[in-house]
Amino acid sequence: MELTPREKDKLLLFTAALLAERRLARGLKLNYPESVALISAFIMEGARDGKSVAALMEEGRHVLSREQVMEGIPEMIPDIQVEATFPDGSKLVTVHNPII
């Protein structure tokens, strides 16, 4: 199976998000890469489901809370930008202050 670099990036992001979900389920606090991966995967899956950019910008702020991440992580992530594939093409989704 041949994958493009973009497809490889998506698979890596999905794998990191899956790991983050498992760690959250065990009661662990997420670090920076896990937090970014989980929110990014949420946005990409929402785009695939047909949600609007505006809806994902708002919903992306409620994926994680401060209590679910390590100390200092919310300040390290002022915004997250994800190029997601929507039914009508690729669009850039920006989530400001994603961990509240």
UniProtKB/Swiss-Prot annotation:
Major site of localization recorded for this protein: cytoplasm
The reaction(s) this protein catalyses: urea + 2 H2O + H(+) = hydrogencarbonate + 2 NH4(+)
Highest taxon of the lineage: Bacteria
Pathway(s) where this gene product acts: Nitrogen metabolism; urea degradation; CO(2) and NH(3) from urea (urease route): step 1/1
Location(s), subcellular: Cytoplasm
UniProt GO BP: urea catabolic process
EC supergroup of this enzyme: hydrolase
A Pfam family the protein falls into: Urease_gamma
InterPro entries per record: Urease_gamma, Urease_gamma/gamma-beta_su, Urease_gamma_sf, Urease_subunit
GO molecular function: nickel cation binding; urease activity
Keyword Membrane recorded: no
GO cellular component: a single term: cytoplasm
EC number: 3.5.1.5
Record key words, sorted: Cytoplasm, Hydrolase
Subunit description: Heterotrimer of UreA (gamma), UreB (beta) and UreC (alpha) subunits. Three heterotrimers associate to form the active enzyme.
Similarity field: Belongs to the urease gamma subunit family.
Protein name: Urease subunit gamma
Record organism: Escherichia coli O157:H7
Lineage: Bacteria, Pseudomonadati, Pseudomonadota, Gammaproteobacteria, Enterobacterales
